[in-house]
Design a protein with these regions (language model features):
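Conserved SAM/SAH-binding beta-strand->alpha-helix loop
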Residues: 98-100
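Conserved SAM-binding loop of SAM-dependent methyltransferases across substrates and taxa
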Residues: 76-87
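Conserved class I S-adenosyl-L-methionine
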Residues: 2-61
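A short glycine-rich, Lys/Arg-flanked "PGG" loop and its adjoining helix->strand segment in the class I
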Residues: 150-162
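A short acidic, Gly/Pro-enriched loop at the edge of an enzyme's catalytic core
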Residues: 126-134
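Conserved SAM-binding strand-loop segment of SAM-dependent methyltransferases
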Residues: 111-123
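Conserved beta-strand signature within the Rossmann-like core of class I S-adenosyl-L-methionine
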Residues: 163-170
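Conserved SAM-binding loop
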Residues: 105-106
Length: 211
């Protein structure tokens, strides 16, 4: 059962999704710029739970070379840095709505010429279907209503090149709702799903392949 703060959190973002996609994007950018007024607001670089989630995410990937990688909702680039170390030959793009977060991400990796950070909104961003691997972690619940989740699923699927892999990581059992349009998408097939139930918060790592 969700806690009261989680319920209020979800209600807030569901209300935001009553706006147009563009209007919702403006509010989300302002919200996350405010949230990043102090560095690493979620303690992603030091929290044991977050580090466990990163390791678990990588453990579920199909073993293959990945040349072009995108992380949607990269925040300050903590997981992006891990990806750059794990795949030293890959071109990596980190995407977030908060320019303040991206400034810190660029400062974290100032010499990583093959890593770039881009301010963009997954609901409106247009990119070539060129990525071998796309990550979307702890992001979809900010989008609110089902029509926005459906739109995000379409957008995520379009990022993948032939044979590309999409990894979605979200709280369990909320992931069932958040991933439903990915599960049903005509251009995606679910490859694996693993649920981690250790405290403080269960989560699911769901891996999809481009058809």
């Amino acid at each position: 059962m969700r806690s009261l703060p989680e319920l209020l959190h979800r209600t807030l973002f569901r209300t935001m999704s009553l706006l147009s996609p563009k209007g919702q994007g403006v509010i989300l950018r302002r919200y996350f710029d405010w949230w990043h007024r102090s560095p690493d607001p979620w303690k992603l670089s030091s929290d044991g739970y977050e580090q466990h989630k990163y390791r678990s995410t990588l453990e579920n990937l199909p073993a293959r070379p990945y040349v072009r990688i995108m992380e949607v909702g990269c925040s300050e680039g903590v997981f992006t840095e891990t990806l750059a170390k794990t795949y030293p030959e890959a071109e990596i793009t980190g995407v977030d709505v908060s320019e303040r977060a991206l400034e810190r991400a660029r400062s974290r990796m100032p010499d990583a010429g093959r890593v770039r950070f881009l301010r963009a909104d997954i609901l409106t961003h247009r990119a070539e279907p060129r990525y071998d691997l796309v990550f979307c972690s702890e992001t979809l619940y900010y989008l609110g209503r089902h029509d926005r989740l459906r739109r995000a699923s379409d957008q995520l699927s379009r990022l993948l090149g032939p044979g590309g892999v999409l990894v979605a990581v979200h709280p369990w059992p909320e992931a069932v709702r958040l991933h439903r349009f990915l599960d049903a998408h005509a251009s995606l097939s679910r490859l694996t799903e693993r649920v981690y139930t250790a405290p403080p918060r269960p989560f699911a790592v769901t891996v999809y392949g481009a058809r």
